[in-house]
Amino acid sequence: MKQNIIVALFNISSEAYQAFSELKAYSQITDALVAQAVLIKKENGLIIPAESTDFTANTAESAWTGGLIGSLVGILGGPIGVLLGGATGALIGSDVGTAQTLGEGALLENAAKKLDNGSTAIIILAQELNEAILDAFFHRFKTVILRQDAVVAQQEVLAAIEAEKEVARQAHEAWKKQRKAERKAERQGKVEAFKADIKQKFDKLAAKLK
């Protein structure tokens, strides 16, 4: 049994909603257990959770937000996701119908690059003995499936969080340097104005002596 994170990227948004509706009624089997799932869409560069379900909870649809899936969604929608995916993302058309098992450092980058504006995806936390079961579920639609061991995905998340902190630190340092330069220029401007004012005063006094 392997615990996996599965990202199913859809070419057609309506199919993503249909698939998620069917997924919420998913009949659990030993060979493919689904714990949590969230449907996300990308609009104007923002990652928006549209629907979610948690088979491990009696209520609280948002229970996924504090776990691995929530972290993945947050990172994909954050500065690291933007850096990994570029400005527009890449169309998934040529990859439709494929299922890719990814190694370390690959899930976030691949998902970010394939999520372009207007696209949708379903992210699942599953335990699988037979990966073909969920592949078959999603390949009824025009999808690309990305799969990664959940532990490896968690390691990616932790690395991305550290990277985000470093990006924030560097941005803050750059901002402080910019403000320091602006304040220095402002002070210099005041000094020059003071020098000009003093010179003018003494020039007037000198003129009276002529």
State what each model feature region is:
Residues T56-L102:
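Short, low-complexity, glycine-enriched hydrophobic/amphipathic alpha-helices that associate
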Residues Y26-Q28, N110-K113, L134-D135:
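A generic local secondary-structure boundary/capping motif
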Residues N4-N11, T120-A126:
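Short cationic amphipathic helices and targeting signals
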